Amino acid sequence: KLLFGARVIPYRGSWLDIEFDHKDIIHCRIDRKKKIPITTFLMAMGIKRDEILSLFYGTETYSLSTKDDKWKVGFNPKNIKTGKLQKSLVNAANGKVAVKQGTKINPAIAKKLFNDGLKNLLLEDDELIGKFIAEDIINEKTGEIYFESSDEITSETIEKIKELKISKIPVLEIDGINIGSFIRDTLRVDKNLSPEEAVVEIYKVLRPGEPPNLETAFEVFNSLFFKS
């Protein structure tokens, strides 16, 4: 298995190594120190945890039709790669199969289908399984969180969504082919919840043995990347 990596060597300042592990989690090393999740580094840069997903992924809205108990989502020709369709494309406008499973397709054909009127697709429940929720889904009245952003959609998830009569769910644009779930997966294993926690974690790596202080931690981090 190929493990990808990159190294940023500035004219001045700290070296930054970025690398995948065998589970496709993305880590980074500052000045070749102990590795940390890349999402920890992003949070230390001031990006909030709930902003990281939207920074790297688009969002699709899946709408549940109570009429036929199927899901409707916009058809994006750009998401189509050259090859055979794994699932039939069903036109949500009339419920008819626009292109059968196993048919060879490419971006040009997909664009023509879109121009000819294929704007939305109709999907079965199983076509959502394995995808990821893009935003927290909450009870507007009580504030109860039903599902958290980045949660993987399972058959149990779909069953609960229907029980709660939730008609729309935001889903991350991750297909495992054009766009991988690497950042999402890394965020799931990252225990830091805020920029403050992240910068303290990095300070512990850079200055092991020294008691962490938030103000000092920010000063050290900023001196590595933002001060000449």
For the regions a language model picked out, list residue spans one by one:
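N-terminal non-catalytic structural scaffold regions of very large proteins
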Residues: 1-228
